[in-house]
């Protein structure tokens, strides 16, 4: 905060306010400049963070729980719904700068690719999960992300079963999402984590909500 400490040679003015908003979001409005001209730099940042925590999540679209069959019978291809979600994300960036700046950061950390997932409802739930947790506890965030339908699809968690384990997500969990490559974990850790995450592969309809399936869960002891 040293660079923002007001002084005669370093006034807290519109250029500084705009700089703060560019670093914490995607810019500010004239009304923001008017408002925060009466705040200290510390008060400005605290208010931006507090407002982000209080901002409502993006409302669920009517297709938030659709399965593959419902999308296919809707009269629009899936790209149409992907575009709706993309436009909503851009609108959120304009209106909720700080939270969406963090959401953008975390979407580049917990990466999924829409062409690989190819289920708009899964991608909406992924987007909502990031909004809900971008200012929260990282451990909680990681736990929920690992069970998100989009992530289960993208890193093959839905294929992870007791008799045919898939280690893809477990490996990325350590290598990319948490500890970093070669940083204090072993192949055995990956194996045991994959076993602990088996069973999330039951759907009542094709590409509907993914549920836990006790029959494909590895109930053996993990170490």
Name these PLM-found stretches.
Residues 6, 20, 57-60, 100, ...:
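Generic detection of intrinsically disordered/low-complexity segments and helix-coil linkers/edges
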Residues 16, 23, 28-131:
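N-terminal accessory alpha/beta regions
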Residues 1-55, 148-151, 157-160, 172-175, ...:
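Cell-wall polysaccharide-cleaving catalytic domain and substrate-binding groove, primarily
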Residues 2, 52, 67-68, 83-86, ...:
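Active-site substrate-binding loop specific to GH73 endo-beta-N-acetylglucosaminidase modules
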Residues 4, 21, 26, 39, ...:
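Phenylalanine-focused residue identity feature
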Residues 7-16, 93-98, 184-188:
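Structural motif
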């Amino acid at each position: 905060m040293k660079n923002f400490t007001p002084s005669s040679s370093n006034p807290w003015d519109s250029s500084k306010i705009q700089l703060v908003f560019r670093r914490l979001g995607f810019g500010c409005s004239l009304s923001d400049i008017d408002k925060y001209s009466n705040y200290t730099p510390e008060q400005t940042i605290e208010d931006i963070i507090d407002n982000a925590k209080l901002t409502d999540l993006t409302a669920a679209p009517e297709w938030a729980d659709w399965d593959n069959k419902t999308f296919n019978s809707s009269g629009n291809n899936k790209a149409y719904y992907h575009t709706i979600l993309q436009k909503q994300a851009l609108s959120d960036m304009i209106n909720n700068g700080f939270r969406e700046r963090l959401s953008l950061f975390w979407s580049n950390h917990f990466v999924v690719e829409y062409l690989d997932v190819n289920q708009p409802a899964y991608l909406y739930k992924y987007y909502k999960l990031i909004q809900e947790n971008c200012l929260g506890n990282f451990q909680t965030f990681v736990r929920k992300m690992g069970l998100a339908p989009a992530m289960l699809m993208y890193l093959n968690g839905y294929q992870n079963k007791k008799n045919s384990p898939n280690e893809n997500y477990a490996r990325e969990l350590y290598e990319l999402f948490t500890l970093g490559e070669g940083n204090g974990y072993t192949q055995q850790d990956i194996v045991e984590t994959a076993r602990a995450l088996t069973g999330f592969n039951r759907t009542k309809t094709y590409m509907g909500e993914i549920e836990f399936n006790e029959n494909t869960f590895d109930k053996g002891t993990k170490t």
